[in-house]
Amino acid sequence: MNELALKYGCNPNQKPSRIFMQDGKELPVEVLNGKPGYINFLDAFNSFQLVRELKAATGLPAAASFKHVSPAGAAVATELSDTLKKIYFVDDLELSPIASAYAMARGADRMSSYGDWVALSDTCDVQTAKLLQREVSDGIIAPDYTPEALEVLKTKRRGTYNVVKIDPDYVPAPIEHKDVFGVTFEQGRNELKIDEAMLMQNIVTQNKELTEEAKRDLLIALITLKYTQSNSVCYAKGGQAIGVGAGQQSRIHCTRLAGNKADIWYLRQHPKVMSLPFVDNIRRPDRDNTIDVYISDDYEDVLADGVWEQFFKTKPEPLTKEEKKEWLKTFSVVSLGSDAFFPFGDNIERAKRSGVQFVAQPGGSIRDDNVIETCDKYNMTMSFTGIRLFHH
């Protein structure tokens, strides 16, 4: 099959719609269940490239959670702590390596991952399928599925859950095309290989140390950015992206957005948040929304009398600004990637507040000296990769 008709394009009025191979060859995908749409396939093809490159760079199973053609989260399989199992709501499950990777990718920013598209570098097993079964998700792409996993996935969304199988050996044409306003754009594919050598070739700060964990996390950040709508910045820790700032016109706004998401990820681990007394059988999306509001400055929206009773068995004490500030002071050993250079040191100042210790960015700003000086002030390690990672 070299063509697949779709219901419509980005919006219901955009018809007809299809995906097809310009060279007449077979499509590299097979729809095993459901009817994926135009945006579903944009997410699928972008996200699978991301996880395939993460697997190649780290040697570990990888997963991504995509929304609107940018990753909400991405991760490689690592051992989850009891704390992370609890905040990702998987402490009651036995997790395989690929299931752990998806739990991390989904868990980093659960608000943004609501209704996500899932990508796996490895075969989807029944543990991953059971994890997905209880989450709100639009679909999944993977190189294969075990029979048990496929059976579970086919029960989601009353049997309409989108399941796509992709040829893991598929190699796209070296030249890609895109039409905008009736004009065809042509460019070479971004086949840049992101690896440790790129990180080590030009460390510009006084501190030259890059731990093995930092190298892994910087690779995760940069590969995530390669498939994130620009401008973009990514914070990573423990084998996963913990904050992605996508599609901002200003670099500092990317850094703030991603940093705020990373802060929320860490605040979810605060003892007060982990011990919230939720009512029995609260829906997972309601729990996620409640936690998000509880952590924010608008906590009264879920703690006001007549409201808290919907969510909690007993009224919790608020998480105060002072408590949040003190907790965030313990945030550390975070890695940060940027898809283009930092024009000023203010980005580093903001990153420091979210525990950043390691930075990878292209360099090339006329104020590189200011950025380096700011890193040196905090004894950070910063690598200039010399490579821009814009994606549109």
Task: Walk through the language-model features, giving the residues of each.
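Active-site loops and adjacent core secondary-structure elements that bind or stabilize anionic groups
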Residues: 1-198, 214-232
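Flexible, glycine/charged-enriched surface loops at secondary-structure junctions
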Residues: 57-65, 163-166, 230-237, 267-278, ...
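Active-site-proximal loop/turn and secondary-structure-junction residues that shape catalytic pockets
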Residues: 70, 124, 237-240, 342, ...
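Glycine- and Gly-Pro-enriched alpha-helical subdomains that act as flexible
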Residues: 72-111, 242-341
